[in-house]
Amino acid sequence: MAQLLMVTVTLGCISLLYLLPGTLSGSLGKGLRHSRPREPPAKIPSSNLQPGHPSLQPVVWKSRRHAPQPQGRGNRALAMVHLPQGGGSRHPGPQRPTGSRRPHAQLLRVGCVLGTCQVQNLSHRLWQLVRPAGRRDSAPVDPSSPHSYG
């Protein structure tokens, strides 16, 4: 059972590698293709660059449609895939309405500044201050001591 799971995961990873641009060329026996190093993103855009200038667009976020195609030999299975240039879909059939859907696996950050430990420490401190007066620790809570915060 474990071997079947391992084979399934391995084949899934290999097929995902073939879908990524520039990771494998040809078959598995030909080896890996060396990729070019990425350009660092522009830190501060200068005033003489136009908004559509290519140096303002990070390389990581470019769509595969607009990325330059490598010259020479490539994966023939990937070369057969036609990427439409006019914004159409490469999947035939009925079109689904595309809305602003968020991916399920990615969490959105909503601006919480406090970390988990800070929230736990503040909760513990609040509990220390408002807990019932019947049961107290042997030592009183010292607000200036870092040990009284958690």
Curated annotation (Swiss-Prot):
<feature type="propeptide">
    <location>
        <begin position="26"/>
        <end position="100"/>
    </location>
</feature>
<keyword id="KW-0372">Hormone</keyword>
<keyword id="KW-0964">Secreted</keyword>
<keyword id="KW-0027">Amidation</keyword>
<dbReference type="GO" id="GO:0045766">
    <property type="term" value="P:positive regulation of angiogenesis"/>
</dbReference>
<dbReference type="GO" id="GO:0045776">
    <property type="term" value="P:negative regulation of blood pressure"/>
</dbReference>
<feature type="site" description="Required for CALCRL receptor interaction">
    <location>
        <position position="109"/>
    </location>
</feature>
<dbReference type="InterPro" id="IPR051665">
    <property type="entry name" value="Adrenomedullin-reg_peptide"/>
</dbReference>
<dbReference type="GO" id="GO:1990410">
    <property type="term" value="P:adrenomedullin receptor signaling pathway"/>
</dbReference>
<keyword id="KW-0732">Signal</keyword>
<keyword id="KW-0165">Cleavage on pair of basic residues</keyword>
<dbReference type="GO" id="GO:0010628">
    <property type="term" value="P:positive regulation of gene expression"/>
</dbReference>
<feature type="signal peptide">
    <location>
        <begin position="1"/>
        <end position="25"/>
    </location>
</feature>
<comment type="similarity">
    <text>Belongs to the adrenomedullin family.</text>
</comment>
<dbReference type="GO" id="GO:0005615">
    <property type="term" value="C:extracellular space"/>
</dbReference>
<feature type="disulfide bond">
    <location>
        <begin position="112"/>
        <end position="117"/>
    </location>
</feature>
<dbReference type="GO" id="GO:0005179">
    <property type="term" value="F:hormone activity"/>
</dbReference>
<dbReference type="GO" id="GO:0007189">
    <property type="term" value="P:adenylate cyclase-activating G protein-coupled receptor signaling pathway"/>
</dbReference>
<dbReference type="GO" id="GO:0007631">
    <property type="term" value="P:feeding behavior"/>
</dbReference>
<feature type="site" description="Required for CALCRL receptor interaction">
    <location>
        <position position="121"/>
    </location>
</feature>
<feature type="modified residue" description="Tyrosine amide">
    <location>
        <position position="149"/>
    </location>
</feature>
<dbReference type="GO" id="GO:0001525">
    <property type="term" value="P:angiogenesis"/>
</dbReference>
<feature type="region of interest" description="Disordered">
    <location>
        <begin position="28"/>
        <end position="102"/>
    </location>
</feature>
<dbReference type="GO" id="GO:0044877">
    <property type="term" value="F:protein-containing complex binding"/>
</dbReference>
<comment type="function">
    <text>Intermedin/ADM2 is a peptide hormone that plays a role as physiological regulator of gastrointestinal and cardiovascular bioactivities mediated by the CALCRL-RAMPs receptor complexes. Activates the cAMP-dependent pathway through interaction with CALCRL-RAMP3 receptor complex.</text>
</comment>
<protein>
    <recommendedName>
        <fullName>Protein ADM2</fullName>
    </recommendedName>
</protein>
<keyword id="KW-1015">Disulfide bond</keyword>
<feature type="site" description="Required for CALCRL receptor interaction">
    <location>
        <position position="116"/>
    </location>
</feature>
